């Protein structure tokens, strides 16, 4: 299998540089006239799968599935399988983070051979970047991707992410460590794009420098959260092709009509299409 970095680059080139979120929170289920049950969750996801077929990347927010226990995880597994059957890359927004054998278990679940394993997964480096090593290694071995939280758009994040770490912010330290990992893997895989990226919010002021990352930058917060799609170019010194804007509510609030959700997604894709420029 080709590495995630190369698959992502190909998907963006052919389907556009946009990641669409599936965030089935109870308020949205009610707005779509669906019950806040596992059955309502499944119906919501069926609409999203139909609307998002043909797009590059879809990001299910795992927490909203966990809320329904085993039934929710079953819906998540089925949704991921249906998306991938349509050629869509699946990014599991799980934000996992731990140490040792526990992190190894997360690695097996989200980046190994489990039914939950996605094309890529989000992780938290709060326990130290080295704590992510088990998952990074499993993901690399299985040609999957990882997105490491670096500079998030929530105001509370700045307390830690902008703290000084030997002359650079914690966010910059994380970006630099990811860049080093991509360089190490690149010595083995050659010129293939890096498969480990970072998360930098669209509304972050003074974002970290990602020009040396060697991997993709997931940019959530576009749309309702205040990020302007036309203002993403050059974020953190990124090349246009590095950026992967992510949008959820701006598109999902157009539901429950499949055609309306798809039309909203296409409008957002049009607004970020300039990021595909070579």
UniProtKB/Swiss-Prot annotation:
GO terms for molecular function: orotidine-5'-phosphate decarboxylase activity. It catalyses: orotidine 5'-phosphate + H(+) = UMP + CO2. The active site is at residue 95. It is an enzyme of class 4 (lyase). CDD domains: OMP_decarboxylase_like. It comes from the Bacteria. Gene3D superfamilies: Aldolase class I. InterPro entries: Aldolase_TIM (IPR013785), OMPdecase_AS (IPR018089), OMPdecase_type-2 (IPR011995), OMPdeCOase_dom (IPR001754), RibuloseP-bd_barrel (IPR011060). Coiled coil: none annotated. SMART domains: OMPdecase (SM00934). One of its GO terms (biological process) is 'de novo' pyrimidine nucleobase biosynthetic process. Pathway: Pyrimidine metabolism; UMP biosynthesis via de novo pathway; UMP from orotate: step 2/2. Its EC number is 4.1.1.23. The keyword Lyase applies. Keywords: Decarboxylase, Lyase, Pyrimidine biosynthesis. Belongs to the OMP decarboxylase family. Type 2 subfamily. NCBIfam families: pyrF_sub2. PANTHER family: OROTIDINE 5'-PHOSPHATE DECARBOXYLASE. This is Orotidine 5'-phosphate decarboxylase. It comes from Mycobacterium ulcerans (strain Agy99). The lineage of its organism: Bacteria, Bacillati, Actinomycetota, Actinomycetes, Mycobacteriales.
